[in-house]
């Protein structure tokens, strides 16, 4: 079934820990876009910040390195953060943002926490705006791919390609 779905129609959405999973998916598969809500650079960085006296690097089996997954990743990305997030603090989101090569939308909702973000009326409109930006980016990318596959009119005319402008 996956083979029948055009990558230009698939978006990955990840919320909190799921943002690292969505980032990984966007690295491994061509996607139209990826939406990361309350994302972070890595679980290891969050753990080190909160438990600086513990050798978290030795204890973590899965580091969920979202920033590493997004480095050099051409997938259009949208990010929604919570200004009052106490789970994923702003420096962790900022570290991820610094690695995004194709950021098409970014919003930080004020008066929003990690768990309360979804209750705000602004969340729905922000989601809609994020998906709109991702859709626009995917559409532009599709046009660029299509334009690259078409021969330039002058080249087509020189080679007598079908549909080329006739010589005058």
Residue ranges and their predicted role:
Residues 7-53:
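Primarily recognizes the serine-hydrolase "nucleophile elbow" in alpha/beta-hydrolase
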Residues 72-74, 78-85:
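Short beta-strand/loop motif that positions the catalytic acidic residue
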